[in-house]
């Protein structure tokens, strides 16, 4: 029978000092011997996805205490990728993921916590906490802050839906007047919550449902809706139940590594492909799998991407639907239900509710259940009122969207495309692979051959795009922006957004060893591995080289002879694999990250051979 980890600091005469300190935090005599449960919050006033989380820890803690546990809350850092975008701050985004994972490990192990509830939301916070949960392997439940309501404004007397990307794109479009840019800016992000499209934050919060570590509705229920409160309350109660099952009944099936098995990781990746999620999820799932010691690799992703169709298109892949529409269509349980019916899901994986994922689908899929409470839950909708308050409204759609032929979520028969929403490409320029969000690529450029125009930083690429150097037919190369080369693997949302703003969104391709925001669409290929700083072929590309991209056949080739590439490689070995003229201040913290980082195909995790 497992012993409470917290007994290390709460039991025995020699722990009198530790108990004295615990008492100073408010613990009473009868609390010693109860499970101490870490409430891992990420409240910050810097990030709209986290600005409403201050009181969420208290909600969870009250339920833990009522159910017989002891709750102790701490906070992690949280970086807003949108605010950090387009300047040196973006170098810190991906490294913050690993820092969050480490800080959770430090706090939980230093204080011998028995379990944890992870209150996350935005881009690197959910992955960081997920990595920590896999690493620690103690009972854990995830509950996120929820998505933002989509923005809405009138342009040319027409009501349109908006999100962050619209504000960025229109600001760079010289044909859009200042008044319209101002109107879009003030309407794009109306409430608290993670940005309203299927960007990285929402993608990851959806994937925790597929992994079995969060509750149904976690990825799609709006941050502002009163119904979301129940997710926090249930998380607090359920974590105590998981503690009892593990520590009192010796049931290891409730532990994260028992729930998030390889089959569960395949379910999560299949969901990501089906919903056209962010390419960043590939990076984070690979990293979490390594922490879980699960053999889940790019080869598995490639295999799944060849058979899973695209069942949902949400912003930025379309302007028609946002997360509030996904929820109305039944949320993640509905997409998983369609995958199950297409025999593309492992239905026997477990969840923190003690059910299999198949049992949860049977209970929560709106096309299967007649339960009015479930239908009411998925009719929760936006209020259209600017607010930073959670649970501040109780608006509902009149009906759910259960149209699987023409609705937001489709069946396999009526899929947006039989080819999935993400694809891995390989070739001589990306021997270990690269990733493209096919759900955001126009059909006319699924095959594309063009001339390379090379930039050795994101900043240089932005100047080139806005300065007129990039023309139709170019393949824009942005290199030395990988985990090592950046260091930090910046997101390239500004270059892709600016290409669209000047009318080249369907006329150019972009290839980088960096990564893309979940808000990116177009022929944008990231995670090129090995990266330039590790001697990858992307570091050998020269202006004017032909590059052939063939998404249907999963191929990307630099059309330069092996002999010429060998000559170039010898020259580059002499020069060193670093950008020629880039001026960039890099802190010691970032240098440390870059020194230990692997390429994107390994999840940009630490290279353990260097430890």
UniProtKB/Swiss-Prot annotation:
Binds 1 [2Fe-2S] cluster per subunit. This cluster acts as a Lewis acid cofactor. Its EC number is 4.2.1.9. GO terms for cellular component: cytosol. The modification N6-carboxylysine is found at residue 124. The active site is at 517 (proton acceptor). Pfam families: ILV_EDD_C, ILVD_EDD_N. Its cofactor is [2Fe-2S] cluster; Mg(2+). One of its GO terms (molecular function) is dihydroxy-acid dehydratase activity. It comes from the Bacteria. [2Fe-2S] cluster binds at residues 122, 195. Functions in the biosynthesis of branched-chain amino acids. Catalyzes the dehydration of (2R,3R)-2,3-dihydroxy-3-methylpentanoate (2,3-dihydroxy-3-methylvalerate) into 2-oxo-3-methylpentanoate (2-oxo-3-methylvalerate) and of (2R)-2,3-dihydroxy-3-methylbutanoate (2,3-dihydroxyisovalerate) into 2-oxo-3-methylbutanoate (2-oxoisovalerate), the penultimate precursor to L-isoleucine and L-valine, respectively. NCBIfam families: ilvD, PRK12448.1. Homodimer. This is Dihydroxy-acid dehydratase. It comes from Actinobacillus pleuropneumoniae serotype 7 (strain AP76).
């Amino acid at each position: 029978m497992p012993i409470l980890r917290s007994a290390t600091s709460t039991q025995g005469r020699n722990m009198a000092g530790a108990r004295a300190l615990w008492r100073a935090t408010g613990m009473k005599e009868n609390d010693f011997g109860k499970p101490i449960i870490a409430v891992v919050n990420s409240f910050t006033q810097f990030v709209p996805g986290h600005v409403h989380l201050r009181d969420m820890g208290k909600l969870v803690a009250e339920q833990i205490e009522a159910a017989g546990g002891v709750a102790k809350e701490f906070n992690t850092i949280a970086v807003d990728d949108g605010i950090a975008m387009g300047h040196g701050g973006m170098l810190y985004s991906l490294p913050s993921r690993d820092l969050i994972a480490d800080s959770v490990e430090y706090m939980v192990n230093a204080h011998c916590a028995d379990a944890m509830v992870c209150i996350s939301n935005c881009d690197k916070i959910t992955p960081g906490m997920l990595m920590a949960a896999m690493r620690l392997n103690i009972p854990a439940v995830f509950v996120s802050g929820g998505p933002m309501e989509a923005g809405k404004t009138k342009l040319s007397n027409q009501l349109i839906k908006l999100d962050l990307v619209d504000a960025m794109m229109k600001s760079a479009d010289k044909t859009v007047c200042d008044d319209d840019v101002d109107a879009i800016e003030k309407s794009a992000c109306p409430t608290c919550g993670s940005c309203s499209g299927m960007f990285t934050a929402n993608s990851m919060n959806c994937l925790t449902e597929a992994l079995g570590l969060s509750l149904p509705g976690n990825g799609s229920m709006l941050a502002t809706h009163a119904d979301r409160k129940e997710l926090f309350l249930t998380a607090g109660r359920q974590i105590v139940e998981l503690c009892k099952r593990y520590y009192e009944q010796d049931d290891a099936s409730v532990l994260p590594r028992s729930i998030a098995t390889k089959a569960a990781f395949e379910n999560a990746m299949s969901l990501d492909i089906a919903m056209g999620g962010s390419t960043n999820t590939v990076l984070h799932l690979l990293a979490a799998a390594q922490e879980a010691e699960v053999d889940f690799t790019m080869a598995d992703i490639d295999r799944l991407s060849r058979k899973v169709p695209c069942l949902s298109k949400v912003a930025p892949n379309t302007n028609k639907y946002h997360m509030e529409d996904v929820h109305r269509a039944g949320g993640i349980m509905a997409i998983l239900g369609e995958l199950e019916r297409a025999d593309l899901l492992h239905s026997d994986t477990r969840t923190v509710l003690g059910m299999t994922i198949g049992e949860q689908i049977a209970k929560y899929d709106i096309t299967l259940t007649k339960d009015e409470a479930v239908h009411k839950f998925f009719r929760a909708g936006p209020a259209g009122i600017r607010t930073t308050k959670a649970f501040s409204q109780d608006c509902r759609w009149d009906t759910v969207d259960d149209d699987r032929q023409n609705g937001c979520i489709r069946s396999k028969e009526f899929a947006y495309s039989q080819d999935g929403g993400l694809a891995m490409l390989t070739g001589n320029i990306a021997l270990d692979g690269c990733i493209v969000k096919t759900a955001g690529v126009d059909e006319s450029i699924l095959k594309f051959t063009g001339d390379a125009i090379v930039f050795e930083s994101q900043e240089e690429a932005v100047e080139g795009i806005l300065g007129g150097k990039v023309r139709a037919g170019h393949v824009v190369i942005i290199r030395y922006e990988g985990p090592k080369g950046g260091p930090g693997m910046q997101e390239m949302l500004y270059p892709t957004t600016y290409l669209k703003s000047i009318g080249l969104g369907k006329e150019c391709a972009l290839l980088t060893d960096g990564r893309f925001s979940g808000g990116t669409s177009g022929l944008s290929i990231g995670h090129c591995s090995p990266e330039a700083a590790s001697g990858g072929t992307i570091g050998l590309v020269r202006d004017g080289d032909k590059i052939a991209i063939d998404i249907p056949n999963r191929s990307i080739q630099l059309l330069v002879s092996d002999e010429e590439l060998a000559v170039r490689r010898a020259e580059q070995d002499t020069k060193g694999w670093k950008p020629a003229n880039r001026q960039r201040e890099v802190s010691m913290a970032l240098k440390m990250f870059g020194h230990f980082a692997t390429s994107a195909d390994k999840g940009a995790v630490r290279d353990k051979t260097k430890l």
